């Protein structure tokens, strides 16, 4: 099986000319207003990273903690892509657009120290969240010819990827859950409690789980993901972890195995093939 997967990897990544991504700011009026003394329209922002080759497929990405991208311009994409940020050319080569997703303007509040003040589980699990994302999907379809949509979350972003997968059903082609959060934040259970007993069997579209086997973050235990995964789990091995064990440079975020993890995700999107382990 490993030699077959290797051949597939060559098909997608071998001898491909360099491709580029063009960042495009997207804003959707979600049809509601916010404000106390004066009302203003609520907008859902995203950044489309559009490949230089034609594509009809996009991966909507929700970042890890704080979970709020705070998008102001099209240049805010890199700090919000976690371990995918240095491998966007691989998506361009595969003909997959990346869409960096933010929380809507009425849920977009972050305190010093990267502490979210909004966009918690109440919003992420709601029909309103799914409706807001539908607005972006509609813009991608009508403006850029995107008809195949996948949703991915990393760490706290998996609150969105799981609930959107449930609430959008077959409106999307699949969902990817990286370093899934399954234990609520100990300082505020409104961040993470909704997925402590989440029913993964309720998801209609295909599902991929990817998790480092030595993830040490207390909110994202590997054993829990193993327990609910079937044949749809990629276990990442090896690499190196530095800094915060729940941060962007540790094994929690595929430290030292970022490229291999990215390639495995792309391979699943293109072929539905799951590599049981990578990084050995």
What are the residue ranges of the model-derived segments?
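N-terminal signal peptide c-region/cleavage motif recognized by signal peptidases
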Residues: 12-14
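N-terminal cap/lid segment of alpha/beta-hydrolase-fold proteins
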Residues: 19-54
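Short, surface-exposed "cap/lid" segments of acyl-processing enzymes
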Residues: 52-90
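Alpha/beta-hydrolase active-site loop
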Residues: 83, 109-143
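Conserved alpha/beta-hydrolase
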Residues: 88-110
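Primarily recognizes the serine-hydrolase "nucleophile elbow" in alpha/beta-hydrolase
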Residues: 138-202
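The feature captures the conserved acid-bearing segment of alpha/beta-hydrolase catalytic domains
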Residues: 174-238
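C-terminal catalytic histidine-bearing segment of alpha/beta-hydrolase fold enzymes
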Residues: 231-280
């Amino acid at each position: 099986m490993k030699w077959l997967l290797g051949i597939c990897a060559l098909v997608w990544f071998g001898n491909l000319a360099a491709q580029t991504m063009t960042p495009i700011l997207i804003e959707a009026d979600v049809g509601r207003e916010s404000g106390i003394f004066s009302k203003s329209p609520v907008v859902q922002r995203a950044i489309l990273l559009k490949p230089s080759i034609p594509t009809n497929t996009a991966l909507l990405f929700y970042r890890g903690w704080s979970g709020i991208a705070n998008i102001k311009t099209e240049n805010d994409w890199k700090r919000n892509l976690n371990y995918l940020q240095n491998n966007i050319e691989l998506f361009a080569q595969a003909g997959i657009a990346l869409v960096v997703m933010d929380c809507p303007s009425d849920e977009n509040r972050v305190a010093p120290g990267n502490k979210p003040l909004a966009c918690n589980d109440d919003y992420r699990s709601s029909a309103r969240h799914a409706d807001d994302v539908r607005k972006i999907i509609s813009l991608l379809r009508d403006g850029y010819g995107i008809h195949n949509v996948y949703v991915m979350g990393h760490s706290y972003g998996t609150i969105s990827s799981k609930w959107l997968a449930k609430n959008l059903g077959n409106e999307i082609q699949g969902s990817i859950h990286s370093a899934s959060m399954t234990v609520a934040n100990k300082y505020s259970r409104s961040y993470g409690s909704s997925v402590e007993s989440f029913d993964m069997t309720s998801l209609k579209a295909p599902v991929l789980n990817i998790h480092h086997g030595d993830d040490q973050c207390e909110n994202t235990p590997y054993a829990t993901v193993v327990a609910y995964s079937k044949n749809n789990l990629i276990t990442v091995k090896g690499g190196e972890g530095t800094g915060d064990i729940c941060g962007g440079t540790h094994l929690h975020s595929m430290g030292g195995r970022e490229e291999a993890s990215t390639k495995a995700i792309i391979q699943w999107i293109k072929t539905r093939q799951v590599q049981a382990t990578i990084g050995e």
